[in-house]
């Protein structure tokens, strides 16, 4: 039975003329699964987490846990009766309690503390049990917050951007350990993050949100291979969105050249309608191409209609910003492609690369013959 199931969830805060913060969210968390809620600031992911936790009452829809209804607009079960653990980005530890007392805080009086001791050892804190939060590093405090959340053996732990206040090395180490810790504890998890790399790296599935709408909930591989909307491709992959013109039944043109239908089957959205989350209709019926930054090749050309506007060094490659056709594109190129700002150039789709056409959701590739 699903630890968490969200059905038709709508929510808005009680202020004058408030817009909907969540719009028709459907989501199901499977046992032992870690699901990421991914999206830009203000998209509603933390609100959704708070509704699951019981800190907010939904305006419409329902939250169910293990088949039991815990929240509707008329009926609401308080957080302490839902059997969930919470981990916040600011740790929320009790400053006057030691690491041991913080870990045991959620246990019932007289409850066995052996699990708390096991968790502290699992998280590498067994020698720090007598220290207070101010005597711990940021990474140690977040480990302690996780131990406290897991000590009562919740079926679900909810994590609200738990790594955002940590330095890079500690953040990478902790996030890589999280799935194994949850697995050892037999606990499912919901992770809020605005970092696509973080969500793709550790989550079993990722729910991509924008303006209160769930665009797609799928495995990381499916999000990369078959994004359900231009927004998913843009936010998750940092892909380029290009206008495209259709010519007849099987030819298209864009600023990267002439295109034809790819021989690769059209990608299938994973999850089906039950996980679509009320995906809104496209803002326009105009076709648009989703193009990976690594799928575009650049050639210096004094007569070219594109211009290098800037670049960022990414260690093993450059990320170029190129203006073409009145818009800015992102290109990922190897380090030997050394072009300065102001360089005139021509752009083309790399041979053998595929791009995704919306709203049709079919794959296109470079045409074998130029359009006549």
Model-identified regions with their sequence ranges:
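Conserved ABC transporter NBD signature motif
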Residues: 61-72
